[in-house]
């Protein structure tokens, strides 16, 4: 069952500017070591595209989960997006932030069992789309449906 969806678009030029003006420490508060390492391996414009899609992914995951949890903010580093050997993106739910926060804990709290992600770039834009899949709420209906459907209409 779909529990949440999230989408985000960011300008690649915005990420390029961030990379060129922020310190390594500041970038390390936005991206994981693995994400920064892969971007460095790609080099040049490809590194900016890579980081822009990762930034959009972090925002899209947050949007997909925001209505399912009391948390209205979380450390962006807990959303680590990597690629399988064949190039498909995936969200690594077991990455742990420096504060000990883990995406896996939020997924368990919200009943989300899988995050499906798609990312793309076009011109100066990077977009990520996320579907949060999970189990029904305690009443047997989706919590999101319970929010938008008046009780007498159920």
Regions found by a protein language model. Give the residues of each.
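Core catalytic alpha/beta fold that binds nucleotide/phospho-ligands
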Residues: 1-154
